[in-house]
Amino acid sequence: MNYTCTRDNSTSISASKAILAGISPDGGLFLPEEFPKVSLDDIAKMRSMTYPERAAYIIGLFLTDFTNDELKAYTAAAYSKSRFGEIPAPVVDIGGESILELFHGPTSAFKDFALQLLPYLLTASAKKQGINDKIAILVATSGDTGKAALEGFADVDGTGICVFYPYGGTSEIQRLQMTTQQGKNVLVTAVKGNFDDAQSGVKAIFTDKAYTDELKGMGIRLSSANSINWGRLVPQVAYYFSAYCDMANAGAVKFGDEINIAVPTGNFGNILAAYIAKLCGLPVKRFICASNKNNVLTDFIQSGTYDKNRPFYLTTSPSMDILISSNLERLLYLLSGRNDAEVRGYMAALAKDGKYTVSPGLHRAIAAEFACGFADDARAAETIRRTFEERRYLADPHTAVAIAVYEEYKLSTGDCTPAVIASTASPFKFSRSVLKALGKDTSGCEFDLIDRLADISGLAIPSRLAGLRDMAERFTGCIEPAGMKSFISKGLIK
């Protein structure tokens, strides 16, 4: 299976080349030239598999230049009991809906599913391509991706990783997870501005041909651990198939019937992975795209106009504080009939004017698949409180946004299709916001709050979050976006 580019249909490269590159030189994103088909019989066979086996099966359909034995070894290591516990992606019934818990990995966020596996895929891809260069991983993060990438790539031979996060734009626990990171090959800095500034800076570096050529001359290749990299996205497709199997096994859905999937959405990668699962054969009726107050996606799905020219809000769900949703480009490409010229036009308009309006036909195609809505901090807090009091389920602010938007969708449409809601982070990463939502005391340091939340909820504190209290901060700097390239050159290139 080869991969093409959202901005150039003449591109045709292998999976390993796409993973190594991360992003096309023209700024476009890679997608399979065609999607593999997964029949109901195939899904039925997955019902008795372990999570690593399910993941290896689905990922193997996309990464055809990897052997089945290779992928089984990688998923067994990446999703081991020591990293994810007994059940990496459990589905929990909260009374009417199913919650897909994606926060049981080493950094307590859904990004672990991709970023524990990506180092294996990336280093193997380099070997398959006969490349011995050092691979420099660049990451822009709104909170969770940075730590998950650092955890995955720390001290991996032949790699270095540099993470940029928005100053003041993460939770305190998210910040500490990054600034205390151990490893000889890791580098972290805050960037003045918001996530979009950091992400735009990283994209600009990738498409700076003079700079990337200079690095290649020094034996260094840039790659990405953001979801613009196909190697980040494909592991996420697997957990939606796994969720369906677990729902069927638990009787939450009759096998073969459709489900709805609700996802808290910022950069559009997680919900796009769910849509790709449907394209492959997963029985899905509707996708519910849930935004916070930065509701650019809600407005787009409703109107057909994407406009980032709006106020940027810092919310209690910081991983969704995004106004430029990079993975939306992949959806535009797919639903426009793989019209690369049309996508180039939209992306050029976004770069020039900060907005674009899709064709009526494309807008209808998007609206047919995706419902949408948003919940501000007050609604998210009320949902946290009510969900805990009525269902005894403790949700983090991102998950609460998805629950609130899904409940609104169900009420307004009467659609009672069995649903799964993606829970993307542990509530302990956002203890202050969760405690405030519950009407509890929020005085004291972050670790006092974590302890208090554990006492109230009866839940165990993730061990790696608890361990942060004894770790010293290594990375305390903050730079201007214009200084990102210089920071990389001074720090990673030695």
Language-model features: where?
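PLP-dependent amino-acid enzyme catalytic core
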Residues: 1-494
